[in-house]
Amino acid sequence: MIPGELMPADGEIELNAGRATVSVTVANTGDRPIQVGSHFHFYETNAALAFDRETARGFRLNIAAGTAVRFEPGQTRTVELVALDGDRIVYGFNGKIMGAL
């Protein structure tokens, strides 16, 4: 073994297997790009993003950890969200929940 060497298993790795997902259509109504990270509570994203926030409550982007999705001004796109796991307690972000979901 070489320090830092990666030895991935054969086949494909399915992210968030068996977790609840929803799709939402999101429009950036602002005049600047907005980037949302993989573990940000989507319900609490920038107010310039127009979408059904109640559907997104308790969900985050269904993308690989450490990555993000960028919404350009005027852009509309559909994204898949995955349910937050664990204790489902949310603190921080934009302070809209600050407790159990």
Curated annotation (Swiss-Prot):
Q: Which reaction does it catalyse?
A: urea + 2 H2O + H(+) = hydrogencarbonate + 2 NH4(+)
The UniProt entry, under InterPro entries, shows: Urease_beta-like, Urease_betasu_sf, Urease_subunit
Q: What is its main location?
A: cytoplasm
Keywords assigned:
Cytoplasm, Hydrolase
Presence of the UniProt keyword Cytoplasm in the record: yes
Record's subcellular location: Cytoplasm
| Any one of the GO BP annotations | urea catabolic process
The GO molecular function terms of this record are: urease activity
Q: What is its EC number?
A: 3.5.1.5
Short name of one Pfam family: Urease_beta
Q: Where along the sequence do coiled-coil regions lie?
A: none
> What cellular component GO annotations does this protein have?
urease complex
Q: In which pathway does it act?
A: Nitrogen metabolism; urea degradation; CO(2) and NH(3) from urea (urease route): step 1/1
Describe its partners and assembly state: Heterotrimer of UreA (gamma), UreB (beta) and UreC (alpha) subunits. Three heterotrimers associate to form the active enzyme.
- Which family does the similarity line name? Belongs to the urease beta subunit family.
Q: What is this protein called?
A: Urease subunit beta
Gene name linked to the record: ureB
